């Protein structure tokens, strides 16, 4: 379970959110809503440890994340605004690299399957620098199909993704929740309209 209590963030003397509290349980899909500038990305970065908070506490599995950082990061997959892919490597090599640093045992076939899921079949050996922005985003998203992490935190994962790609990702997110995972994301698109697993947390007015 992810627990956030009394979380406050201030940027340039402006309060983005104050005394924010929520709990997220395994099996939930959580969409962070709010206008631009209300702190959606800031919230995700604070939870992942990449951003600073004014005050508040974040717990994972009952432990403060600062005291169990290694365990938390083993359970976390974070995809931010930037794709995080290495432009000099191919799509296949990028996924192989990420799996190796996470000490995940992954076969070549599993990597090819993940790239097929995101519509990159036939582009596996193309250097990422030669792919479009949307295709580079897909390389990053392919990590989700290989992920063994429980907690997925995704900042605008649907950017530059077509309608069919959105449907595929929506199904993957729902499957992850069904398997006891947690998906926490920001997006400007309507998703999971009929899902009882969906929760929305709104920032700002």
UniProtKB/Swiss-Prot annotation:
Give the signal peptide as a residue range, or say none if absent.
none
SUPFAM superfamilies associated with the record? P-loop containing nucleoside triphosphate hydrolases
What keywords appear on the UniProt entry?
Answer: ATP-binding, Cell inner membrane, Cell membrane, Cytochrome c-type biogenesis, Membrane, Nucleotide-binding, Translocase, Transport
Q: Residues that bind ATP, according to the entry?
A: 34-41
Protein's GO biological process: cytochrome complex assembly
Q: Name one GO cellular component term.
A: plasma membrane
By its UniProt entry, which PROSITE patterns does this protein fall under? ABC_TRANSPORTER_1, ABC_TRANSPORTER_2, CCMA
User: One GO molecular function term?
Assistant: ATP binding
Q: Which reaction does it catalyse?
A: heme b(in) + ATP + H2O = heme b(out) + ADP + phosphate + H(+)
Could you say which EC number(s) this protein's record lists?
7.6.2.5
Q: What is its main location?
A: membrane
What the entry lists under InterPro entries is as follows: AAA+_ATPase (IPR003593), ABC_transporter-like_ATP-bd (IPR003439), ABC_transporter-like_CS (IPR017871), ABC_transptr_haem_export_CcmA (IPR005895), P-loop_NTPase (IPR027417)
Tell me the Gene3D superfamilies matching this sequence.
P-loop containing nucleotide triphosphate hydrolases
**How does it sit in the bilayer?**
Peripheral membrane protein
What sequence ranges are listed for the domain ABC transporter?
2-204
The UniProt family comment states: Belongs to the ABC transporter superfamily. CcmA exporter (TC 3.A.1.107) family.
**Quaternary state and interactors:** The complex is composed of two ATP-binding proteins (CcmA) and two transmembrane proteins (CcmB).
The record's function comment reads: Part of the ABC transporter complex CcmAB involved in the biogenesis of c-type cytochromes; once thought to export heme, this seems not to be the case, but its exact role is uncertain. Responsible for energy coupling to the transport system.
**Descriptive protein name:** Cytochrome c biogenesis ATP-binding export protein CcmA
